[in-house]
Regions:
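Short alpha-helical donor nucleotide-sugar binding micro-motif in glycosyltransferases
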Residues: 295-300
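Nucleotide-activated donor-binding/catalytic signature segment of Leloir-type glycosyltransferases, i.e.
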Residues: 268-291
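Conserved acidic donor-binding segment of nucleotide-sugar-dependent glycosyltransferases
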Residues: 341-349, 357
């Protein structure tokens, strides 16, 4: 597997979850990753592609020249030599953005070796000239060819240059010609976009993200007592990286309208974000302790996901598995995992206030387990080899 991170964040955990199951069935698996640390129990799977310095250099070049995915040639060539020796039966791609790998070098190897490829697209980056999500600005340039990108300064940000037109056509050429490739999307919404992109005609399969229901379940704890929230209605938000597009400032707006009976709790913030938020919001930094996270989910009265663009957020699944109802904006694939009555228009703070006051919100029923996700992937592996 190839992904920007290993064992952390939603995509990194998906990789290690699959690796665990493969190992249990007697298979061998490696996760090649680009950045950040790996939890110790998963180091046996991990192979790092780029050093921290190489990631920084790639990031600087991407910001200066708007060429994300086209740097790190030396590191990628070195990685391909390792892959040649390892000689995998199948390659499973995940996020190829993140300032760690060169797509031209990678796909030259893939086409030359004609290995079966599964590519799980967690966002839209693969078929745009720049951005990973465009729903918030209703951009449709990706349908015919990106240019004059309105999200040039959005991730992966470019400070000066707009190379979205070149990037679009470069990706279209690089990703074409892979004979045995299946694209997997976590949501029907993203599958419909891929079908309209230059990947049209490629086999596409929807496999919903799954979560570890042995961990994410109603969990007792002392979270209320620890933070003095015994008599409060807790409104929770969780993200691996908070930003405006994740709805961070919508929580600020909401906090200004709530009375003292409520407390907003946000998990996953940076230290600087914590310092900037108003006192009405309890700000908690990132945690890799998923058992602790399950306790927080279970304690909350309502989970709010005001995302402006998301594929199939696992936080929705985790919260509901812990017994907490979820409300989300009508955007992307986020709506596919919650009851329809819990969905409101994007940016509708008044609508959010109405749902917050509702004491009878439901939870979506279904099998969102890790087991169903992993089994579907392994069946796909067997079909592809």
């Amino acid at each position: 597997m190839i992904n920007s991170v290993c064992s952390i964040r939603s995509t990194g955990r998906i990789c290690t979850d699959i690796a665990n199951k493969l190992e249990q069935e007697g298979h061998e698996c490696k996760i090649a990753y680009g950045r950040e640390n790996v939890l110790s129990e998963y180091e046996k799977y991990a192979h790092r592609i780029t050093s921290p310095l190489e990631v920084k250099i790639d990031g600087v070049k991407s910001r200066l020249f708007d060429n994300a995915g086209l740097n790190s040639k030396r590191a990628t060539k070195k990685f391909i030599k390792w892959v040649e020796k390892y000689d995998p039966d199948l390659i499973h791609l995940h996020n190829l953005h993140g300032y760690y790998i060169n797509i031209e070098v990678l796909f030259e190897y893939i086409k030359r070796k004609n290995k079966p490829v599964i590519w799980t697209m967690h966002d839209c980056w693969a078929f745009t000239g720049h951005c990973s999500h465009f729903a918030r600005i209703n951009c449709d340039k990706w349908l015919s060819g990106c240019h004059h990108c309105p999200k040039k300064k959005g991730y992966p940000s470019s400070v000066f240059i707009d190379n979205s037109k070149r990037n679009y056509h470069k990706k279209k050429a690089v990703f074409a010609g892979v004979e045995n490739m299946t694209i997997v999307t976590p949501s029907k919404w993203l599958a419909s976009l891929v079908e309209q992109s230059f990947f049209k005609g490629t086999k596409i399969q929807v496999i919903n993200n799954g979560i570890n229901t042995d961990i994410f379940k109603p969990t007792q704890g002392n979270f209320r007592e620890k933070y003095g929230l015994q008599n409060k209605k807790i409104l929770l938000g969780v993200a691996s990286a908070w930003s405006e597009s994740k709805g961070l400032y919508d929580f600020v707006k909401l906090s200004e309208k709530l009375d003292d009976n409520y407390k907003i709790v946000l998990v996953g913030l940076t230290e600087s974000q914590c310092a900037e938020l108003p006192p009405q919001i309890l700000a908690i930094t990132r945690t890799t302790n998923i058992n602790e996270l399950a306790e927080v989910y279970s304690t909350a009265d309502l989970f709010i996901n005001p995302t402006y663009g998301d594929t199939y957020p696992t936080v929705n699944l985790e919260a509901q598995a812990c017994g907490t109802p979820v409300v989300t904006y009508k955007t992307g694939g986020s709506v596919e995992s919650v009851p329809s009555e819990n969905v409101i228009d994007t940016g509708d703070i008044e609508g959010l206030m109405s749902i917050v006051a509702n004491e009878n919100l439901s939870i979506k029923e279904g099998d969102f387990s890790l087991k169903q996700m992993v089994n579907q992937y392994i069946n796909l592996y067997k079909e592809s080899i």
